[in-house]
């Protein structure tokens, strides 16, 4: 009998395979509670992954043997249950096209509102608000995101600052080059202008001297030479005798 029992246990273990256990109620209370906690957490994680990866509306409701409630819903448990009831009633009485479109757009609107709410919560978390609902792991992830964001902002700021400095240095070199060019032009003009001014002064002086000398010569001639008509006798008194000179 013992050999037969041992062979039966071996056959049953072979049927279950490696790493598998027989699915039946766990009699030990402590083991049952530990298994419940592990399986519950795994089920909640799978429900979350399904809702995120497949964009599915998921609602999960769990009651423990003690009557404690555990739930998860990416939208809301009540809303998902109402949708379930409506889907069951629609299976009996199919809705019209208008009702189907209305239901579709309501679902899309609800999804958009949920996304907006998530974005608003994320924005509040970034500025340090509404942090009471976050656990340690979520706070750690938020801290890492903020540090990465600050690092990117600083890197971009430094990049713009370096570009601005390079532009100003280039502009300074251009202005210095233009300044040197203008100084060279001014120096060249200063070298050429004295020759031109000297030649113009010489020409003006020559013209002035020539004009003055001709005028002075004419005045000199007028002063040194008596006009001929003054030496000629007056034709009015030419026929009369001139009175003798009388000494008084």
Curated annotation (Swiss-Prot):
Task: Kindly list any coiled-coil regions of this protein.
Answer: none
Family annotation (Pfam families):
K-box, SRF-TF
Major subcellular site: nucleus
Q: Which residues form the K-box domain?
A: 102-192
Of the GO CC terms on this record, one is: nucleus
GO biological-process terms attached to the record: flower development; positive regulation of transcription by RNA polymerase II
Cystine links in this protein are: none
Places the protein is found: Nucleus
The residues covered by the MADS-box domain are 18-72
Q: Mind listing the UniProt keywords for this protein, alphabetically?
A: Developmental protein, DNA-binding, Flowering, Growth regulation, Nucleus, Transcription, Transcription regulation
| Example of a GO MF term | protein dimerization activity
Subunit field text? Interacts with AGL15 and AGL16.
Q: Which PANTHER family match?
A: SERUM RESPONSE FACTOR HOMOLOG (PTHR48019)
Q: What does this protein do?
A: Probable transcription factor. Interacts genetically with TT16/AGL32 in a partially antagonistic manner during flower development. Is essential for the coordination of cell divisions in ovule, seed coat development and endosperm formation.
Report the protein name in the record: Agamous-like MADS-box protein AGL1
The coding gene here is: AGL1
């Amino acid at each position: 009998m013992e050999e037969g029992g041992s062979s039966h246990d071996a056959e049953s273990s072979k049927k279950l395979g490696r790493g598998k256990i027989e699915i039946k109620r766990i009699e030990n209370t402590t083991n049952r509670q530990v298994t419940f906690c592990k399986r519950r957490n795994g089920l909640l994680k799978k429900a979350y992954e399904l809702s995120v990866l497949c964009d599915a509306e998921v609602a999960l409701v769990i009651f423990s043997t003690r009557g404690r409630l555990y739930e998860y819903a990416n939208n809301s448990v009540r809303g998902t249950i109402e949708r379930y009831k409506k889907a069951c009633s629609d299976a009996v009485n199919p809705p019209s096209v208008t009702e189907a479109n209305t239901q579709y757009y309501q679902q899309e609107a609800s999804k958009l509102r949920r996304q907006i709410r998530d974005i608003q919560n994320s924005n509040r978390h970034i500025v340090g608000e509404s942090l009471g609902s976050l656990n340690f792991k979520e706070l750690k992830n938020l801290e890492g995101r903020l540090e990465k964001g600050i690092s990117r902002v600083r890197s971009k700021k430094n990049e713009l600052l370096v570009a601005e400095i390079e532009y100003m240095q280039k502009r300074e070199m251009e202005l210095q080059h233009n300044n040197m060019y203008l100084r060279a032009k001014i120096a060249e003009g200063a070298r050429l202008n004295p020759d031109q001014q000297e030649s113009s002064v010489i020409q003006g002086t020559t013209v002035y001297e020539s004009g003055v000398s001709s005028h002075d010569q004419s005045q000199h001639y007028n002063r040194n030479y008596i006009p001929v008509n003054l030496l000629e006798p007056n034709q009015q008194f030419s026929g009369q005798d001139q009175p003798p000179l009388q000494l008084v």
